[in-house]
């Protein structure tokens, strides 16, 4: 897992053909807006989160975000523990996101 600044996350993501954006916020938070093309799995699902993560392709690079960066850091750690090698946490989260947004 790597913690990336907003700028680093955006730059690395834009140059990564193997990237998947993962939003780990609640459905209510997602409904208020999200990063385009993000896959949503709520980290508060507990074991359900792990079950859904295990269905993902572990060979991809995962750019993970939440509201402020705390839950996404936890999500990256969980993903690493079940075999995902390339996870990138967005420090500051969606609350500081300056890139494209979708409602």
Task: Give each language-model segment a name.
Residues 65:
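Short, surface-exposed ligand- or partner-binding patches at beta-edge/loop junctions that are enriched
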Residues 1-20, 27-61, 70-103:
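Rhodanese-like catalytic fold shared by cysteine-dependent sulfurtransferases
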């Amino acid at each position: 897992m790597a913690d990336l600044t907003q700028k680093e996350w955006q730059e690395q993501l834009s140059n990564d053909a193997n990237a998947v954006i993962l939003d780990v916020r609640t459905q209510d938070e997602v409904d208020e807006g999200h990063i385009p093309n993000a896959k949503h799995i709520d980290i508060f699902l507990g074991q359900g989160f792990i079950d859904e993560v295990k269905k993902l392709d572990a060979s991809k690079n995962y750019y993970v975000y939440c509201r402020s960066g705390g839950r996404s850091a936890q999500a990256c750690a969980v993903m690493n523990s079940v075999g995902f090698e390339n996870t990138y946490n967005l420090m500051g989260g969606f609350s500081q996101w300056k890139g494209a947004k979708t409602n």
